[in-house]
Swiss-Prot record:
A motif (DEAH box) lies at residues 281-284. It comes from African swine fever virus (isolate Warthog/Namibia/Wart80/1980). Its main location: virion. This is Early transcription factor large subunit homolog. Induction: Expressed in the late phase of the viral replicative cycle. Putative initation factor. It is found in: Virion. InterPro entries: Helicase_C-like, P-loop_NTPase. It holds the Pfam family Helicase_C. One of its GO terms (cellular component) is virion component. Its EC number is 3.6.4.13. ATP binds at W99, Q100, T101, G102, T103, G104, K105, S106.
Length: 1133
């Protein structure tokens, strides 16, 4: 066979010599030397000193990266390696991607799957399927649908997806027309992945769903309470060992159970997997001892049930493949190594690898050598700490000892328990064993109704999750008031929680505050306020639990100390996101008051709501945290979620084990997660809080025990990784023990790889891939420099790391492939490869010249003919501007079918002499939004009066309007124009700021960041608004919301929609007019004219209210305009 077998003595050596792998050894390059190369080739496009670099082709940005780059997704070397290793041309059946969090495991798996999909497309019939199984399957689907480079969607479809996402977000409703269009479009794309008639080859399952669909318990099995797990019998539950006869005969036992009518194996799934590909993400979840399930049994069955040549290939992924217990290595190896390649052709048993006595476990002699041998050729290991891409990880606090033994790796924020906590802990005895329902004792205790005053001698608190809710719920109202406790109304998703001043750092004089009940949470709050005062930066707070002392109480602690949730309006005690001062004391003149806000993610929140909150927290507009400063997350965030630009991570409780703690670290330390921040801020400070007592305490004891267990796991990790397939390319050398790994050196180094072997490179199409890579590099070089000789271009192409994102060894490129790439890009009468270079549509032309031929990026004219002109690159060239009408959510408020151009012409005709304010009530929202974007992007002439109206009503904003908000002004400061230039406009739920007129790109911020309160108090008389009726806009009125809430309105139709003014009784119209101060002789005025007077009066009052000091925050509401969100009205009678 072309590729070496895994049992070959020199397997890794043979693999490393093949060009498709050897070329992925990233050559070391000195940064100063690389800059010299950039300047020597005249391709430095940015960075300090680029203006003096000797190049004069295109404008140079001294603040940008100096390197040319290739647009779009580029697989990094580790991803390319596993794509080349695990594909239909190689004989390797199973692979574990043991990559640290945030390094692109999902993209690697998709790249592997794409190779198999291309292979299966050649099958005439019975093509196998690709199964993606795991809790994060939705994330993998999302990656497939947002990355056109992966080959599942086109660039045009991705652009349409972004467009639909934007307008659906603006609609503010999951049931709007725009949201339905988005869902339909996404469903169409997803069906392409899974529908064989549309070219789909994928099946997506969660672990539980896969296991339940594979093993169907029959009615007979249900009657006998049959459990598949019973076939995987535990002979000793305490030690969790397996009966070797049972496990070795598991497939046979399934067959017997099927024969006996207890179970039905899904043969359709089995046939789909025959010869297919199985991708299993976060594989440690399928055999975790602490969370017993049948997920691993299902995977083991489908891998073992087929003859070896028909079994599906498998890719497993995990940053921490063993978590709960070191004995999980047995389960991992049984999945990773085909049955016939295990010792004696039988599954591994735990007694083969471990000696155990009671709760003590240790590796047997030679067990680690067996792990090394079995994992050779089956593991890819990646630990990437390149600070060019990853934020620096900084631990706050100090290392601690427990019982005179120093705890390794971790630094802690030591939080001594309060006296009240210590008294409570005494109730558990001298050597307390903390049960699962008593975990709150690690964090805090609750006031105890048994004591009238918590400060009385011998008083102790509550902490048991069974007893605490009952005791507090039955407490008297007087006791609750005396102790500052409020019971939160129970709901289906939050059965019990409390709030109140007892959670405050500064409670009323007679109430014991947070410091009395929790040393840990008091320290957390002090650190949060200190961080806010220090400057910008988002904060992630993690707790493994939801109830009792988990994320729900953390939410209440933040709110009790002046930090708002996503939607609450600021009050006097709300803290500022810039200086942490409360609003009543905010006297800073150098910045506006911006409330500090948090959001929360846990399993009991609807997935759609979690996704929205995460998107807002991660948004580029929230880079500094002034929209959402803090995110509180439970264990739901441990896997599959990525957080962008988080500067501080506060860990309030230990997850189940140290490997999962590493997963929590990895949520915020991810590749490119901090690239939008300045270099000096690309770091994450981690606060690991632990409650302590004078003798250490139960929480510190828990960390000590888990760290001891983790050392054993690390020994297994080292053996697993010792002969990693890509050790010689990833070049991971660890000299001293660290949290992620014990000392480790690759068994093969780049220096001893040996001579390059080309047979498989040429046989399996890697030469074609090299031509494509070279083509992309050539294009990037022409974008930096428009004229090259052949020899100059070849030298630049073969210079390593000259192009950002290309880290393969360019020196191994074939010049023949370079020539092929160049020819394929050059213009001819039969071919014109179009390239966009500096906003010019160009093509590469071959120009015969002496002493050497030239290659020139020539501009194409309107006939797509190349133009070689000496002035091409100094002439200011602007492509024709294309104007489009944006159909947005606002069409749901306006059913008019008239296009913008018709309305625009009507507007120019009607408003030559009319008061310009009337335009706000004569045209639908779609007209206004298209007009606003035209005013901002195209700077329409002769529209000064309309601009002033938009500005008077705080609908449009100029640069001058944004200047009082320094952090927001940074977003638009680079946009050309003076202080009066329009740069943004307000929608129902955000302000859209232009960032590039040329690209028509926008940046959205919440309304409150410009001190716009969407919930201003309504006046006590009447509320006016406009509503679409066909092509007409009708003026409607309704009572103010505070009147509606008093149930004075009994007509439900009136309650929900208001009524057209002209349809109201004459008496009611006159009453409203009199209350508004309209002093004409109303008896002689028609109903139509009277309603016009009321409408204009309300509009005038609305403008005056908005223009009062702080009017957009506290002004009285009179009229809802096209961009105002109407409150939801609910009939309560």
């Amino acid at each position: 066979m072309a590729y070496p077998e895994l049992d070959a003595a020199d397997f890794l050596q043979q693999l490393a010599r093949r060009k498709e792998f050897k070329s992925l050894i990233s050559p070391p390059v000195d940064q100063k030397e690389l800059i010299r190369d950039l300047r020597a080739h005249f391709v430095q496009i940015g960075g300090p000193g680029c203006e003096k670099g000797g190049r004069a082709f295109f404008p140079c940005d001294p603040y940008a990266s100096p390197f040319p780059s290739i647009k779009g997704l580029q697989l990094h070397n580790a991803q390319l390696f596993v794509q080349n290793f695990q594909n239909p041309n190689t004989p390797y059946s199973r692979l574990l991607l043991n990559w640290q969090t945030g390094t692109g495991k999902s993209i690697a798996a998709i790249a592997i799957a794409r190779q198999f999909m291309n292979h299966y497309m050649n099958f005439i019939e019975n093509a196998p399927w690709i199964f993606v199984v795991g809790f994060t399957r939705a994330i993998i689907q999302t990656e497939m649908l947002r990355r056109p480079e992966l080959g599942f969607v086109s660039y045009k479809e991705v652009a349409e997806l972004h467009r639909l996402l934007h307008i659906a977000k603006q609609s503010g409703s999951t049931t709007s027309v725009e949201s339905r269009h988005l869902n339909g479009f996404v469903s169409t794309l997803k069906r392409r992945l899974t529908d064989r008639n549309r070219g789909g080859f994928f099946q997506f399952y969660g672990y539980k769903e896969f296991a339940s669909k594979l093993f169907n318990i029959t009615s007979k099995g249900e009657e006998k309470n049959f459990d598949v797990l019973s076939l995987f019998h535990r002979s000793d539950e305490a030690e969790d060992t397996l009966n070797e006869n049972d496990i070795s005969q598991f497939v046979q036992k399934i067959s017997e159970a099927e024969t006996n009518g207890l179970i039905r194996v899904n043969q359709k799934i089995m046939e789909q997997l025959r010869g297919g590909l199985l991708i299993a993400d976060e594989i440690h979840n399928v055999y975790n001892i602490q969370e017993r399930n049948n997920y691993g049994i299902a995977l083991q069955y489908v891998l073992d049930a087929f003859p070896p040549h028909q079994a599906p290939r498998a890719v497993f992924m995990s940053a921490t493949p063993v978590t709960g217990s070191v004995m999980e290595y047995v389960d991992l190896l049984n999945l990773l190594v085909p049955r016939h390649e295990l010792p004696n052709g039988q599954p591994l048993q735990r007694q083969q690898l471990f000696d155990s006595s009671g709760h003590s476990v240790k590796w047997k002699k030679d067990a680690l050598a067996l792990v090394e041998r079995l994992s050779t050729g089956r593991v890819s290991f990646l630990l990437d700490t390149n600070t060019n891409f990853y934020p620096e990880r900084i631990f706050a606090g100090k290392m601690l000892s427990y019982k005179d033994e120093k705890l390794p790796y971790l630094h802690f924020i030591e939080c001594p328990m309060s006296e009240y906590q210590l008294e409570t802990l005494k109730q558990l005895g001298p050597d307390p064993k903390i049960s699962s329902n008593a975990y709150s004792i690690y964090d805090m205790v609750f006031p105890n109704p048994k004591f009238s005053k918590q400060t009385e001698p011998k008083a102790y608190g509550l902490f048991n999750s069974t007893e605490t809710p009952t005791a507090l719920s039955m407490a008297s109202t007087d006791w609750l008031l005396e102790n500052g406790v409020q019971i939160i109304e129970p709901s289906r998703r939050a059965p019990f929680n409390v709030s109140g001043s007892f959670l405050s750092l500064q409670p009323p004089m007679h109430i014991s505050g947070l410091a009395f009940y929790s040393g840990k949470y008091t320290q957390m709050m002090k650190d949060i306020l200190s961080i806010i005062r220090q400057g910008r930066g988002k904060i992630l707070i993690y707790h493994n639990r939801v109830r009792m002392s988990g994320v729900l109480i953390l939410q209440e602690i933040l709110q009790s100390n002046g930090i708002l949730n996503e939607v609450s309006s600021p009050v006097g005690t709300t803290r500022c996101s810039i200086c942490a001062a409360i609003r009543d004391d905010h006297t800073h003149s150098d910045h506006q008051f911006i409330p500090v806000r948090f959001t929360i993610l846990h399993s009991e929140i609807e997935p759609a709501v979690r996704e929205r909150s995460l998107a807002l927290f991660n948004a580029s507009s929230n880079l500094e945290g002034h929209q959402l400063r803090i995110l509180i997350g439970s264990k739901v965030i441990v896997e599959g979620l990525n957080f962008q630009a988080v500067r501080y991570e506060m860990i309030m409780s230990l997850p189940l084990d140290i490997p999962r703690l590493i997963q929590v670290f990895g949520r915020v330390v991810r590749k490119n997660s901090h690239m939008e921040l300045p270099p000096s801020e690309r770091n994450v400070t981690i606060y690991l809080y632990v409650s302590t007592t004078p003798d250490g305490g139960p929480e510190l004891a828990k960390y000590a025990q888990k760290l001891k267990e983790y050392i054993l796991i690390q020994e297994g990790d080292k053996a697993l990784r010792k002969h990693a397939i890509d050790g010689f390319t990833n070049q991971i050398k660890i000299d001293k023990p660290m949290l992620e790994s014990l000392p480790l050196s690759p068994s093969i180094t780049p220096a001893n790889v040996g001579a390059t072997v080309l047979n498989t490179f040429e046989a399996y199409g890697y030469g074609e891939q090299e031509v494509k890579t070279i083509s992309n590099i050539i294009i990037s070089l022409f974008m930096a420099r428009p004229v090259w000789t052949y020899s100059e271009l070849w030298k630049a192409v073969s210079t390593p790391k000259l192009i950002q994102g290309i880290t393969i060894d360019n020196k191994l490129f074939s010049e023949d492939n370079f020539a092929l790439a160049l020819i394929s890009l050059c213009y001819s009468k039969n071919q014109c490869k179009e390239l966009w270079i500096q906003n010019r549509l160009c093509t590469i032309m071959h120009v015969p010249a002496k002493p050497e031929h030239l290659y020139v990026a020539a501009v194409l004219n309107h006939k797509k003919e190349p133009v070689l002109d000496i002035e091409t690159y100094i002439r200011d060239f602007q492509p024709p501007m294309m104007h489009s009408i944006r159909i947005t959510k606002y069409l749901e408020h306006s059913q008019t079918k008239e296009p913008f151009q018709v309305l625009y012409e009507k507007f120019q005709k009607d408003f030559q002499d009319e008061p310009m304010e009337q335009v706000l009530i004569h045209y639908p929202a779609s007209f206004h939004y298209t007009m606003l974007e035209a005013l901002i992007i195209d700077n329409l002439a002769g529209m000064g009066a309309l601009v002033e109206v938009y500005k008077k009503f705080f609908i449009a904003f100029s640069k001058k309007d944004i200047q009082p908000f320094p952090d927001i002004f940074k977003i638009i400061s680079h946009v050309p124009g003076d202080d009066n230039t329009l740069v943004g406009y307000a929608t129902e739920d955000s302000v859209r700021l232009i960032t590039s007129r040329e690209d028509k790109t926008w940046h959205e911020i919440p309304l409150y960041m410009l001190n716009i309160n969407v919930k201003r108090k309504e006046n006590d008389i009447v509320i006016g608004y406009m509503e679409s009726k066909g092509k007409a806009l009708k003026f409607k009125i309704r009572p103010p919301i505070q009147v509606l809430k008093k149930n004075e309105i009994t007509d439900i139709r009136m309650l929900n929609r208001g009524a057209v003014c002209e349809t109201r009784g004459r008496e009611e119209q006159q009453k409203i007019a009199n209350q508004l101060g309209i002093s004409l002789n109303l008896t002689k005025i028609s109903a139509i004219k009277l309603c016009l007077l009321i409408r204009n009066n309300l509009l005038q009052k609305e403008m005056e209210a908005r223009n009062q000091p702080n009017g957009m925050q506290d002004g009285i509401r009179w009229f809802y305009l096209f961009n105002d969100k109407m409150p939801s009205l609910v009939h309560t009678s």
